[in-house]
Design a protein with these regions (language model features):
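Cys/His-coordinated zinc-binding microdomains
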Residues: 17-20
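Histidine-centered nuclease catalytic patch
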Residues: 1-14, 26-45
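C-terminal, charged low-complexity interaction regions
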Residues: 75-169
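Cys/His-rich microdomains that often coordinate metals
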Residues: 23
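Helix-loop elements that line ligand-binding/catalytic pockets
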Residues: 31-106
Length: 169
């Protein structure tokens, strides 16, 4: 362990238990990876049906691949680490988002939109919801407003991801 960095706030990033334990004490060069507090990781990491995570071609690919591997976001059902159920949680969130989008199409009123946002706040998986609702500008705005800490400077006026100022993507 690097004693100098161990208690530095600049070396502190909140992450889920699985991401932290998968990374463990791996010694890394932070500039070889993308970080959600410095980069627009939503621009470089793709979330897809089935809970799958991949790199967006042409956007800091090497750095995105390295962070995905470091924290194990690429683990899938066929990976031996059965205790890591993040892929399953992402798949369930994806399916929930699809159902919510279908219901919104049948009942497109503010109350339904507000209910969906309440569900997102309670369940998480913001990136999945942003992906599923990518063609609904109102929902994208609501999603960005709903979760404190979302960097609105990472998106253009149509809510498409753009490079984060000072970041790698």
């Amino acid at each position: 362990m690097n004693e100098e960095r161990a208690l530095s706030w600049n070396n502190f990033l909140l992450a889920c238990t699985n991401c932290n334990s998968t990374k463990g004490n791996t010694d890394i060069n932070i500039y070889d990876y993308l970080w959600p507090d410095r980069d627009n990781t939503f621009r470089a990491i793709r979330y897809a049906e089935g809970g799958l995570v991949s790199v967006v071609p042409g956007v800091a690919e090497i750095h995105a691949k390295k962070i995905i591997e470091l924290i194990g976001l690429d683990r899938t059902p066929d990976t031996p680490e059965a205790s890591d159920r993040r892929w399953l949680n992402r798949r369930e969130a994806w399916e929930m988002a699809i159902r919510a989008k279908d219901r919104l199409m049948c009942c497109n009123v503010d109350a339904m939109r507000e209910q969906i946002i309440e569900l997102v706040v309670a369940k998480g998986f913001w990136s999945i919801w942003m992906t599923v609702f990518k063609d609904d500008i109102d929902m994208l705005q609501r999603l960005m407003d709903a979760l404190p800490g979302t960097s609105k400077t990472c998106f253009d006026a149509t809510h498409q991801p753009i490079a984060r100022s000072g970041g790698q993507c």
